[in-house]
A protein has these predicted regions:
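Short, acidic/polar
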Residues: 40-55, 135-144, 209-221, 285-296
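Aromatic-lined substrate-binding rim segments of carbohydrate-active enzymes
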Residues: 47-117, 171-199, 246-253, 257
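Aromatic-lined carbohydrate-recognition surfaces of secreted/lumenal glycan-active proteins
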Residues: 109-121, 129, 153-160, 183-213, ...
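Substrate-binding cleft of secreted/luminal carbohydrate-active enzymes
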Residues: 153, 227-244, 257, 264-330
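C-terminal outer-membrane/trafficking sorting elements
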Residues: 332-373
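Catalytic domains of carbohydrate-active enzymes, especially glycoside hydrolases
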Residues: 45-71, 220-231, 297-305
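An active-site-proximal structural segment forming one wall of the substrate-binding cleft
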Residues: 89-103, 124-154, 217-224, 296-297
Length: 373
């Protein structure tokens, strides 16, 4: 199904900044996800310039969401048989991003292998075993290529963990099954190489309470899944047919229970903050909502807040961010009072379904996306 949205590029990030005080450095975001849908087609110089901008804004944690998306995208030079028929082989993104991170002083998280075909069913035990085996092969290949790169902080498991897929939909669809047959072997293999592991679980307030979410994470960690970082998606931007997955008024209740369980198991708690609106535009949300999300995440105990995602920001958004941030630093005047009229240029982006994820069709006639499911 096709969905159309218009993004006002020139003022997109000014909306975000206008909700912050003049002490933007103390409350800024700590990083951003990059799914590669747009950066895969950019030059090394362009990516390096972007990383320098991110670093200057304090957004030093950059999560490359995928190494490979089954059948469609490949972002590093793989020799693995099951990745050779990938449609779009933009296999220099990881290399360009690593070099950019070293130049800028950022920290990279390398996404692993993603296959969304059976993930929401959820997968059977054999399917989980296959998913784990392929992730382990990708992990080994990434380590052989980039294991000595000091800019790499760790790896990111791109499969989204949601409680309601593992809550009795089938007899074998249990938390223990998910942990034993997929999460634990992948996590332990990465940690054995000296790389940290991050996951970004998703939840839906329409389907669960904070108590259910807390019990799910307690079961997951008790089963032996011990990542270094849980960056829970706040769900505020995501929606189905206009029905939001999470509400800014109550999202803190969910974040706090996850933070509590993470603390009990020695796992660092981050928040993956969704920047996009819940309406059909999927453009950057207004200043009040973004400020509320950021404040709530910090109050819940998040040691870092990283944004989803780079496609929502774009180069034009970073242009605006640099401009307003520089004014704030030099003149000590709240950013919201420094806005001046400027022209808006709208770019139309279309979306369709691809392999379990909503994806957009770009002017390059290649697939792109700017938000998670």
């Amino acid at each position: 199904m096709l969905v159309t949205r218009h993004i006002p590029h020139s003022l997109m990030f000014a909306l975000f900044l206008s909700g912050l005080s003049s002490h933007a450095e103390a409350t800024n975001l700590d990083g951003v996800f990059d799914a590669g849908w747009t950066t895969a087609y950019q030059s090394a110089d362009s990516i390096t310039h972007m990383h320098k901008r991110l670093h200057a804004l304090g957004m030093e944690q950059v999560v490359l969401q995928y190494a490979a998306v089954e059948k469609t995208h490949l972002y590093y030079p793989s020799q693995l048989d099951f990745l050779q028929n990938t449609e779009y082989k933009n296999n220099q993104l990881f290399h360009k991003s690593i070099e950019a991170s070293k130049t800028a002083g950022n920290k990279l998280w390398l996404g692993l292998y993603y296959d969304g075909e059976n993930w929401y069913t959820p997968p059977t035990v054999p399917q989980l075993d296959t998913l784990a085996a392929r992730n382990l092969k990708v992990l080994d290949e990434l380590y052989a290529l980039y294991g000595n790169e000091t800019a790499i902080e760790g790896v990111y498991i791109p499969q989204e963990i949601a409680r309601y897929y593992w809550d009795g939909l089938r007899d074998d669809a249990t938390v223990a099954t998910l942990a034993t047959h997929f999460l634990i072997p992948v996590t332990q293999a990465a940690q054995a190489k000296g790389w940290k592991v991050m996951a970004a679980p998703f939840y839906n307030q329409n389907l669960e309470t904070p108590e259910k979410l807390q019990a799910f994470f307690e079961s997951l960690f008790a089963a032996g899944f011990k990542p270094d970082v849980i960056a829970v998606q706040d769900g505020v931007g995501a929606s189905d047919a206009g029905k939001a997955h999470a509400n800014t008024a109550t999202v803190g209740n969910y974040e706090r229970v996850v933070a509590k369980v993470c603390s009990q198991y020695g796992i660092e708690f981050w928040v993956d903050m969704e920047l996009f609106r819940t309406d059909d535009s999927h453009a950057l949300a207004d200043k009040a909502r973004l400020s509320a999300q950021l404040d709530t995440a910090r109050a819940a105990g998040a040691t870092k807040v990283i944004a989803y995602d780079l496609a929502v920001l774009g180069n034009a958004g970073l242009d605006s961010l640099e401009k307003w941030f520089a004014r704030d630093r030099s003149q000590k005047i709240p950013i919201k009072n420094r806005r001046s009229p400027s022209k808006q240029h709208n770019t139309e982006i279309r979306y369709y379904k691809l392999n379990g994820a909503r994806v957009k069709a770009s002017q390059f006639k290649k697939t792109t996306t700017n938000f998670k499911i």
